[in-house]
């Protein structure tokens, strides 16, 4: 069994509060009480509420990367499908809070704007998890494309309350199809589905 860390406890408390009170109801004092930590310790690490969401994103990235088996084989498309489904699996315990945040983002698009560059960074890490190698400039393009795939998948996931997530998987499959066609048209993929370049994706900033 995976050991629960203080950050895990904090993030679980974060999403419980958002699920109950919404983004507008999230305060550092309320979070400190829910997580059983001192408010001063939150101030030291999290200047703003956005920093809490960024922590959650990093933890999800780390969970996916930790579950990646080196040399996993298969096509790029299959590896990306696996990586993004594992990302959704890591998010599933926080589904109620995430869905509430999505609703709040419709009313306050500033949240989405603030998060958008960090989604691109996370997607470049997902390329790493899928063992997709590319030069930095191509990696940025592939990361942007994967962000589009991810957002389309998240929209389906938000509507999909089935246990097997069949609708979500179908949406991901379709989004990957579209992304693959676009990547081929831009010369970013070879005929075998691998990137046309073969240097590591390393740059993530």
Language-model segments: what does each one mean?
Residues 57-64:
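Short, basic, alpha-helical segments at the C-terminal edge of helix-turn-helix-like DNA-binding modules
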Residues 9, 17-51, 55:
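Helix-turn-helix
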Residues 68-100, 107, 117:
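Hydrophobic alpha-helical connector segments
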